[in-house]
Amino acid sequence: MLLGVNIDHIATVRNARGTTYPSPVEAALVAETHGADLITMHLREDRRHIKDADVFAVKNAIRTRLNLEMALTEEMLENALKVMPEDVCIVPEKRQEITTEGGLDVLAQQEKIAGFTKILTDAGIRVSLFIDADDRQIQAAYDVGAPVIELHTGAYADAHSHAEQMKQFERIQNGAHYASDLGLVVNAGHGLTIHNVTPIAQILAIRELNIGHSLIAQALFLGLPEAVRQMKEAMFRARLLP
């Protein structure tokens, strides 16, 4: 199983004081060295954390691959075609939200998403759609030609009871298997921590997890190398469990 380390909140800390540190590039390189299989960055329309220059700098520095999260806008499409990341993950975006609140509604935007997917695919960029574990959305993702989906794990991570968490887990597990049966590559992420990652990592249909906020928070106490190492180890151990 692959680990994508999201470095958005390295930029959040930097921007809080308007300094040049901590460096997203340095964070990306440290994460790679200690187990990250790819680097994920979300260039939001309001540029609240990652800036345009960060994306270019990280793309040019890393040895693994860049997964660029972006909204379904012409501006972001143009940016992606300039940066040429290995992967683009199209996500829903609202300016007022603190973080991404739900999955992309592919059903409501099939024509536009299909168009973006073709343009990016023709440019050699693999397209992923960040969606809820809903069979209708998964089918729509397949229909528009996206080869990859990322299942939104936020409801699982934010569940206030074990029963609710198990309900959300089963939804993700069923969605992952449904998507895999369609031939889609299945990733997952949002709200995952060292404490809740094990059940999700046990779902064999899921190929990759993208984890950011909790990992950067752990890095404040453990250091980024150890935070990445512990997360990768937790994922690895989960795959060994019966």
From Swiss-Prot:
Binding-site residues for 1-deoxy-D-xylulose 5-phosphate, renumbered to this chain: 8-9, 44, 49, 99
Gene Ontology process terms (BP): pyridoxine biosynthetic process
Name under which the protein is recorded: Pyridoxine 5'-phosphate synthase
Broad enzyme group: transferase
Any coiled-coil regions, as ranges: none
Keywords: Cytoplasm, Pyridoxine biosynthesis, Transferase
EC number: 2.6.99.2
Entry function: Catalyzes the complicated ring closure reaction between the two acyclic compounds 1-deoxy-D-xylulose-5-phosphate (DXP) and 3-amino-2-oxopropyl phosphate (1-amino-acetone-3-phosphate or AAP) to form pyridoxine 5'-phosphate (PNP) and inorganic phosphate.
Binding site for 3-amino-2-oxopropyl phosphate: 6, 17, 191, 212-213
Listed GO MF terms: pyridoxine 5'-phosphate synthase activity
Cellular component aspect of the GO annotation: cytosol
Pfam family, any one: PdxJ
Subunit structure: Homooctamer; tetramer of dimers.
Organism: Neisseria meningitidis serogroup C (strain 053442)
Family affiliation: Belongs to the PNP synthase family.
PANTHER family, per database record: PYRIDOXINE 5'-PHOSPHATE SYNTHASE
Reactions the enzyme catalyzes: 3-amino-2-oxopropyl phosphate + 1-deoxy-D-xylulose 5-phosphate = pyridoxine 5'-phosphate + phosphate + 2 H2O + H(+)
UniProt site (Transition state stabilizer): 150
Record Gene3D superfamilies: Aldolase class I
Associated pathway: Cofactor biosynthesis; pyridoxine 5'-phosphate biosynthesis; pyridoxine 5'-phosphate from D-erythrose 4-phosphate: step 5/5
Catalytic residues of the enzyme: 42, 69, 190
Record-linked HAMAP family: PdxJ
Locations listed in the record: Cytoplasm
